[in-house]
């Protein structure tokens, strides 16, 4: 009896955070800085800042396969290598091996994952955009899904709080559909992008073209240098891990902040099996954890639990947390748990060559970690489309073709080689980024008949685009070509690649926030309606998807929920 009591005491914390990625790192930082002894659980390996970025300074000739994946490794990652960084030798080590982490695709869904301390914060695209007022109101206005239990004004101060800490380079553009934030100096558009910007401003009253807002430090402030972070070197090798700490990641930012408090315990190699629910107390008391190396099961205890294992895994943990009170998963009184899975629609690509001659003697200098961006303009203000609701944005880029344009060319000889040393024509590209609606039939389920090597049930994912997404794609494809035509850019490729959901790596929903416990899993502070000391603040909590990159919103939701949780703890309400 004494032994069991002593073990429980040693395994008891004020708070437990499940996951160490973008939102999990924020939860750990906020809870420890508010004085809570916090255990952060990570299912994957530990990754130390700088020392565990093995390729961060490697040139192509220093790589065993010159940056390409060897065939035997490529065969193990058929899903992961569909996304850029996983498809090369420089960044593949931050992605899972598909053969070790199987799941069933009822309909095609490309699930990209990074199982290590830091999660996908090590290889994210770093585009950070606030949601706007419409994004939080459209569900209610249009009768789609459930009404968000919060509005933009509830999250605005937390957006500012997060932006100041992570460091966001951007310009105050004064665009209603893309609210301004707390920005460091922006990176600069190149000459063709500036030309495109002027064209858009002259031709359209409702459209804008801007430098993207990115979580790379153009000019660090004191809050950044105090954590050892320095300015972005514009190497564009971000997906290898940044030795300068110039882009926001758990390793560069939230983890060292949490460690400084002396209140954090980090435990890698720890798969959370389930959350322990006490029927008598009516709340969660801890978690069951599988050691990935020994398969030993251990229980840890805390007054509050933050679930930040990334959308699909967070929901899987809730679904696997069954009890007499919750036979269908923790908090699943509504039946919404596992449903309304969303991703962003990145299907359209349009590219072309600028036909003007005024930039032939111009070039861009160095590299840049930020692309350019056309914020959403559809179904806002006076624009109302008859074929679809919501809207899309574009990620854009411009540059001059280099020697790679000679690949596949039948030419040879000295003259050909000499011509390849000169800059090629200016090119421009646009990728559509569309909102996906919360469809009830897009869902995940546990598969009890198929277990992984740790004895956990695998997942079945059933997700597809619907008519609204398909019609939005057609409009995005046409509008991109129209804008490029106005700018004197000859379109050389324009297509819908029909890729399945998942590849935007913005999966969200499945444990949505809402006002009514009968139709949602979480309340306005990301609490499980029926289990108030469990908070879910990653993408699983989203009630709609907007078309902006979602990570900034996850971080703001997490900081807000942590602040609320600690205040409620002090009131003895949790």
PLM region spans:
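Conserved redox-cofactor binding core of oxidoreductases
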Residues: 64-110, 115-116, 122-130, 135, ...
